[in-house]
Amino acid sequence: MSGDWVHTGQALIWVLWIFAAIIRGSVTEEPHRYTRLGWVQGKQATVLGRLEPVNVFLGIPFAAPPLGPLRFSNPQPPIPWHDLREATTYPNVCFQNLEWLFIYQNLLKVHYPKLGVSEDCLYLNIYAPAYANDGSRLPVMMWIPGGGFETGSASIFDGSALAAYEDVLIVTIQYRLGIFGFFNTQNQHAPGNWAFQDQLAALQWVRENINYFGGNPDSVTIFGGSAGAISISSLILSPLSAGLFHRAIMQSGVAIIPSLKNFDDELKHGLQVVADVCKCNVSDSKVLLKCLREKSSLELLSLGQKTKAFTRVVDGSFFPEEPMELLSQKTFKTVPSIIGVNNQECGYILPMREAPEILFGSNESTALTLIHVLLHIPPQYMHIVAKDYFHGKHSLTDIRDTLLDLFGDVFFVVPGLVTARNHRDADGPVYFYEFQHRPNCFQNTRPAFVKADHTDEIRFVFGGPFLEGDVVMFEEATEDEKLLSRKMMSYWANFARSGDPNGDDLPLWPAYDQNESYLKLDVNISTGWRLKDRRVEFWTDTLPLIMSASKALLSPTFPLILFSLLPPSLLSIAS
């Protein structure tokens, strides 16, 4: 009798254990999840400071491989599979020059896993609390990586810490880069914007499948840095993304950022480079596409490095009009947004790649020459820029610091603030930040004058101090930096949950209203108002009005920064 009781009791214990496991998402070292395409098997990871593991699924396809006839075409649905698919190894990165990934590892003091490269690259990674399963309906945060639309990968970011600490589900994605992501013929044969179409395909996959991993398809926040932030800003403006996401975070990048707009003569030059390098006939778009689809990946990569003419285009579909037109019309979907910049966006990483000589100091003549070359400001107006920025600056280091600030203003701060104002005026909830902390890990590797450089905030957002896997994002973090990382993870996750970053034990983050309040993110968090208000006025009002009086707005050399930021009303007056 007692033996029967013991047997029954043990059986009951097993039933309760199994039931608990189901309730908690079947916590196992080899988690299995169903998708509409087939079953996947992931793995588990741990993070510092948390006992419960994170389920990790790597390399899940969200589109068919863009090979052969699918090169330079919209992404197609992924191919289903019948066996259990192992999702435990990193996918190939999209075709790019891997040299820059290796260089960035050293410059950024990070470590990436060993990654292959292929055009077969449309995959995503998922990081979820181990208990999450169908029915958990956790907020989803989809990260769109940056890299200047030329380099980058889903797998150089690890969402484990953010998922573990904040009970959110993290998705990191990949999209075609360089010429593979943006080649176009400006007609129906190859309208371009393939990279943005890939991002739409990833969002559609999330919409249809993320509930099986414990995510809520009705609570999707897209976030990204640099080119990823530009992509997010573009997705907000595009009518094709309607209903696919509900909140957005743009870290150091927006759609109206200068250098993204190319003119017809630049495209013609790019096509001529194609003709010269690939020996393809560019007079017939169909023939040209057939020729290019027969070229090797390396041949196309080499071609992309010889011309930068192929970038985002107004294709009548993803971009019905120029981004500034769409922004100023305020007909875009007004989702709650966080927009932010770092306080020295062009402090180190970007100059190291584009013009390293200026880091050692610059005189005013050299500085103005660089400004003229990079911004295409006509020589007769350079004295206006010099007076506004360099008045009273004499030492080489003072001029260098001012020049770096100018480039940061032009390419990041002013476009970000103009975008924030337009979102606010379209009745979209907006929160703005300036990240101000120089990471301690650069104490001995960066010049002392560098403050918070481009991308420095990312290691804090992803909980870099708490990662212990293949991706190393933040070695040598101080206790203050660990606390700042925890706070930033909480701000970002709170926003993903509700559209408001504020929460218990966090300094108040005011909305970006008519007072233009913003958060200063540093080890001691505080609030500011009207960030660089005079600089915004200079680039969007003072200088354009002076130039419009002399019809300089009609010149083909009109500076791209102003062309990107001017409201259509001023352009029409000038014409």
Curated annotation (Swiss-Prot):
Gene: Ces5a
Organism: Rattus norvegicus
Pfam family name, one: COesterase
Top-level enzyme category: hydrolase
Residues bearing carbohydrate: 281, 363, 515, 524
Gene3D superfamilies the record matches: alpha/beta hydrolase
Protein name from the UniProt record: Carboxylesterase 5A
pH dependence: Optimum pH is 7.2.
Family matches, as InterPro entries: AB_hydrolase_fold (IPR029058), CarbesteraseB (IPR002018), Carboxylesterase_B_AS (IPR019826), Carboxylesterase_B_CS (IPR019819), Type-B_Carboxylest/Lipase (IPR050309)
Major subcellular location class: secreted
Annotated SUPFAM superfamilies: alpha/beta-Hydrolases
Reaction(s) catalysed (UniProt annotation): a carboxylic ester + H2O = an alcohol + a carboxylate + H(+)
